[in-house]
């Protein structure tokens, strides 16, 4: 067993060796390195064929038409293109957008930018379990609402939103519905023929593909129009100009093919890993799961350890690659905005750790982690006067702290 142990699959996944081998065939002089847009010679035709195959593999993963797949540099760009592109195209109908406070920053910051441009955004509060109350969403919808953007699986707490029902609500009101599926594509079953979703963002590096490549699903029936955010050679049906990165696209296609083939065993594996870790951690006092216990992706376990300071806990667990909050905001010492939105106080939000598992996690690693965490928690709590008071039965909320 190698240290440190990687428990941060929600931040990124290692590229599957089978994916890397496929990518290598499209980079060097002895491979198919041509530009897919070069229509006048064999090098271009070979690259174009590889892109077409990958486009089909991505479409098959989510049961979509390959013509509905637009390549981007990743889910952040897909989110920007979907939200800004739809808002700019449909702004004659209205300027109201609805999203949720626990969305990824790539959605929230994009909405903030649109607010600066004169759009109005409603940020829904989630319930304590991290899920959206659909009645509150319905109440927020107005005649001038043009777009709803809700993620499928939350990157920090792993809860799964009911995008099927939200899609029905949006379609009934003729509102464009965008879903950030960065954390769900390739991990849970997605059927675009059954879902009333207009736009969906997908990332390769969350499902054992390369970084720097993603896709945006853009519905053809009903036809969704976007205003391009990148201008140039008119690639991707004018929606996203730029030379297609054949090797990365091939990698994403292969990652999607493997994800579809191995989804059942991947799900069973991460569920077993999650259950084993939780069984070990749950034997301690004052340990809580954040987010709904049932409606969640099994590869994510977000846990708060009461009476322990989060920074010191992460330092004590230096042999475990875990995170507090998302990778995109983990550099800040602010408590997670997602956990705060759930109603956790600063102390509980600060003492939370996100464990995320994947294809290469082993039971040996889980067992090592359990013992390490138990030891670290015990040591840190022994130093905590609050823990001592709690053990003595003192209600900490009743204490009046002296101001210094």
From Swiss-Prot:
Q: Which residues carry this modification: N6-(pyridoxal phosphate)lysine?
A: 206
Q: Which HAMAP family match?
A: Cys_desulf_IscS
UniProt-annotated binding residues for [2Fe-2S] cluster: 328
Q: Which domain of life is it from?
A: Bacteria
- Which cofactors does this gene product need? pyridoxal 5'-phosphate
Protein name listed in UniProt: Cysteine desulfurase IscS
The record's note on quaternary structure and interaction partners says: Homodimer. Forms a heterotetramer with IscU, interacts with other sulfur acceptors.
Q: Which residues cross the membrane?
A: none
Location in the cell: Cytoplasm
The record's section on Pfam families has: Aminotran_5 (PF00266)
A Gene Ontology cellular-component term: L-cysteine desulfurase complex
> Reaction(s) catalyzed by this protein?
(sulfur carrier)-H + L-cysteine = (sulfur carrier)-SH + L-alanine
| Record: active site | 328 (cysteine persulfide intermediate)
Q: What is its EC number?
A: 2.8.1.7
Per the UniProt record, the source organism is Colwellia psychrerythraea (strain 34H / ATCC BAA-681)
Biochemical pathway: Cofactor biosynthesis; iron-sulfur cluster biosynthesis
Q: Name the positions where pyridoxal 5'-phosphate binds.
A: 75-76, 155, 183, 203-205, 243
What gene is this protein a product of?
A: iscS
GO MF: 2 iron, 2 sulfur cluster binding; cysteine desulfurase activity; metal ion binding; pyridoxal phosphate binding
Output the InterPro entries linked to this UniProt entry. Answer: Aminotrans_V_dom, Aminotrans_V_PyrdxlP_BS, Cys_deSase_IscS, Cysteine_dSase, PyrdxlP-dep_Trfase, PyrdxlP-dep_Trfase_major, PyrdxlP-dep_Trfase_small
């Amino acid at each position: 067993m190698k240290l440190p142990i990687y428990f941060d699959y929600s931040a990124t996944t290692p590229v599957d060796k089978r994916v890397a081998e496929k990518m290598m065939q499209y980079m060097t002089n002895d491979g198919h390195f041509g530009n897919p847009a070069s229509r006048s010679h064999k090098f271009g035709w070979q690259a174009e064929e590889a892109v077409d195959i990958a486009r089909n593999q991505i479409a098959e993963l989510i049961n979509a038409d390959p013509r509905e797949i637009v390549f981007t540099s990743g889910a952040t760009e897909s989110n920007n293109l979907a939200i800004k592109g739809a808002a700019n195209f449909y702004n004659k109908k209205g300027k109201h957008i609805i999203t949720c406070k626990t969305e990824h920053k790539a959605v929230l910051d994009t909405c903030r930018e649109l607010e600066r441009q004169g759009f109005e955004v409603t940020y829904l509060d989630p319930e304590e379990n991290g899920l959206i109350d659909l009645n509150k969403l319905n109440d927020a919808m107005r005649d001038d609402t043009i777009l709803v953007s809700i993620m499928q699986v939350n990157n920090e707490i792993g809860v799964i939103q009911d995008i099927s029902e939200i899609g029905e609500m949006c379609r009934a009101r003729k509102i464009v519905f965008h879903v950030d599926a960065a954390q769900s594509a390739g991990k849970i079953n997605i059927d675009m023929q059954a879902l009333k979703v207009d736009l969906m963002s997908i990332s390769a590096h969350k499902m054992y593909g390369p970084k720097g490549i993603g896709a945006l699903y853009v519905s053809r029936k009903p036809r969704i129009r976007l205003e391009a955010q990148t201008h140039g050679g008119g690639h991707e049906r004018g929606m996203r100009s730029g030379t297609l990165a054949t090797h990365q696209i091939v990698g994403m296609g292969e990652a999607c093919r493997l994800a579809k083939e191995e989804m059942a065993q991947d799900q069973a594996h991460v569920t077993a890993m999650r259950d084993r870790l939780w069984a070990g951690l749950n034997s301690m006092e004052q340990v809580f799961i954040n987010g709904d216990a049932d409606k969640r992706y099994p590869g994510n376990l977000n846990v708060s350890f009461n009476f322990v300071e989060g920074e010191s806990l992460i330092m004590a667990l230096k042999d475990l690659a875990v995170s507090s909050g998302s990778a995109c905001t983990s550099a800040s010492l602010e408590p997670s905005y997602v956990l705060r939105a759930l109603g956790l106080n600063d102390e509980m939000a600060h003492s939370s750790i996100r464990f995320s598992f994947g294809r290469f996690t082993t039971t040996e690693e889980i067992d090592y982690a359990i013992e390490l965490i138990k030891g670290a928690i015990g040591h840190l709590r022994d130093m905590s006067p609050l823990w001592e008071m709690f053990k003595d039965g003192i209600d900490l909320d009743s204490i009046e702290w002296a101001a210094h």
